[in-house]
Amino acid sequence: MYRTLLKSKIHRVKTTHCELHYEGSCAIDEDLLEAANICENEQVHIWNVDNGERFVTYAIKGQRGSGMISVNGSAARRACVGDLLIIAAFAQVAEADVAAHQPQLVFVNDQNRQVELRHHVPTQAL
């Protein structure tokens, strides 16, 4: 049996562009893609912190070091420049490997530059 687990997350990045008439996808600064272990054309789930929208698209490379997060195509209707997004990717993990699985969790500053990398989500407490 396989389980679908969080593989990668880029937490609270700021939308820098919305390109309605681009053919689709989400362009992500190549530095962030590498840090999160997300490859070009990989399916990503995007959750808009500001308006609650959730959508699925695929990642493409944005200019390295630019901080670019460009929501493109019809998905551009689901975000505005300045909106905070969480970008996640998932993987199928064999049951035997679940306990050892560690996601890549990338945290950024307000210029979308990586400031922290973690490999677990802390337990939520009251």
From Swiss-Prot:
Enzyme active site = 25 (schiff-base intermediate with substrate), 58 (proton donor)
Write the protein's name: Aspartate 1-decarboxylase
InterPro entries assigned to the protein according to its UniProt record, in alphabetical order: Asp_de-COase-like_dom_sf, Asp_decarbox
Among NCBIfam families, the record links this protein to: panD (TIGR00223)
Report the residues modified as Pyruvic acid (Ser). 25
**Cofactor stoichiometry and binding?**
Binds 1 pyruvoyl group covalently per subunit.
* UniProt keyword Nucleotide-binding, yes or no: no
- Specify the enzyme's EC class, one word: lyase
Q: Which Pfam families match?
A: Asp_decarbox
Q: SUPFAM superfamilies of this UniProt entry?
A: ADC-like (SSF50692)
A GO term from the CC aspect: cytosol
Q: Cite the binding residues for substrate.
A: 57, 73-75
Biological process terms in GO annotation: alanine biosynthetic process; pantothenate biosynthetic process
Record key words, sorted: Autocatalytic cleavage, Cytoplasm, Decarboxylase, Lyase, Pantothenate biosynthesis, Pyruvate, Schiff base, Zymogen
**From the Swiss-Prot or TrEMBL record, what is one GO molecular function term?**
aspartate 1-decarboxylase activity
Which EC number(s) does UniProt give?
Answer: 4.1.1.11
For the keyword Cytoplasm, the answer is yes
Q: Self-association or partners: how does it assemble?
A: Heterooctamer of four alpha and four beta subunits.
Catalyses which reaction(s) = L-aspartate + H(+) = beta-alanine + CO2
The UniProt similarity line reads: Belongs to the PanD family.
Q: Which domain of life is it from?
A: Bacteria
